[in-house]
Design a protein with these regions (language model features):
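A residue-level marker of the well-folded mature domains of exported/periplasmic proteins
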Residues: 21-321
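Gram-negative bacterial Sec-dependent N-terminal signal peptides
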Residues: 1-23
Length: 321
């Protein structure tokens, strides 16, 4: 099924880029995300789409159907570059695997990275959340939630990561662990779990953690899919009062969990800005204009207490269409 979906994406790409009127009057800058079905990546694509409208750029919206489909994304990148666009914007699925493909692509067109790094020094510019800082923010949010419940930031905590070898997730884990170790001596990391990118796996991991660690007080689920699964497990086991969960990113399900107390806090990026500024930067690079090597697009801790504030509300409810 995955092969079929990638093939369909590549056929769509070829038809889109090679149409007779397509490249005649506007530059083409494809954006390649990790998973076109994910709400997070749909927000990124919405930002890129708006940039295309504002700047007069054709923006093919591409990506595999799962973040674990690394080879699918590599094929899409190679075929995109073969169509000779003005530049390419990509969110690499996996750090090591995308290194060489990005190197090769950058020999032909400017490559702008967003969200997650690859093992390459060939990016013209890289726009992302400072994910180490994002992990620190999550640790602070979790410590505060535990303190509010138990009076002190003390007890057992756990970390759930979606996939191994993903730059952004590794950095979030790094920041989280460093902040816990340096700032919260009363918190003990008793489990560091890595899943397979599926929400059902996160649900099972969280359920097992609840069973194996009866004194568990907090969990950081470091991306949207892991937070979905972990939140579902906490809800099903009625543990929201005793186990505080901090997630990363947001969608309708996680916002619902935030409202009802299943999730204590969400670290929310600005994916719309990431997509918009990715296209804007790529266009500038294609014109040989100077662009920054790195742009931090920011992260914010959102709780039930502040979710209706203007800034936080805009991040939780972006205009996708």
């Amino acid at each position: 099924m995955k092969k079929y979906l990638v093939a369909a994406a590549l056929m769509s790409l070829s038809a889109t880029l090679s149409g007779p009127s397509y490249a005649a009057d506007k530059p083409t800058i494809p954006i390649i995300v990790k998973d076109t079905t994910s709400f997070y990546w749909q927000i990124v694509l919405a930002g890129a789409r708006k940039a295309g409208e504002d700047l007069g750029v054709k923006v093919p919206e591409l990506g595999a159907q799962s973040e674990s489909n690394i080879n699918g994304q590599i094929s899409i990148l190679e075929n995109s570059v073969a169509e000779k666009p003005a530049a390419v914007v990509i969110a690499p699925t996996e750090f090591k695997a995308l290194g060489k493909p990005v190197d090769e692509a950058a020999k032909k067109v400017p490559v702008i990275g967003i969200d997650s790094a690859a093992d390459s020094k060939a990016f013209t510019s890289f726009l992302t959340t400072d994910n180490v800082q994002g992990g620190r923010i999550a640790a602070d949010g979790l410590a505060e939630a535990i303190k509010e419940k138990y009076g002190k930031a003390e007890g057992e905590v756990a970390l759930i990561t979606s996939l191994p070898g993903v730059g952004s997730l590794d950095q979030r884990a790094k920041g989280f662990k460093e902040e816990i170790a340096s700032k919260y001596p009363g918190l003990k990391l008793v489990a560091d779990k890595v899943a397979d990118g599926q929400a059902t796996t996160a649900l099972n991991i969280m359920t097992d953690l609840i069973t194996a660690n009866p004194d568990l007080r907090g969990v950081f689920a470091s991306n949207l899919i892991m937070a979905q699964g972990a939140g579902q497990a906490i809800a099903e086991n009625k543990k929201a009062d005793t186990i505080k969960l901090v997630g990363f990113d947001s969608d309708d399900k996680l916002i619902g969990f935030l409202k009802d107390g299943t999730i204590a806090a969400l670290v929310v990026q600005d994916p719309y800005r990431m997509g918009y500024d990715g296209i804007k930067t790529a266009l500038a690079a294609s014109k040989h204009e100077k662009v920054p090597a790195f742009v931090d697009t920011g992260a914010n801790l959102i709780t039930k207490a502040n979710m209706d504030q203007p800034k936080e509300h805009a991040l939780l409810f972006p205009k996708v269409k």
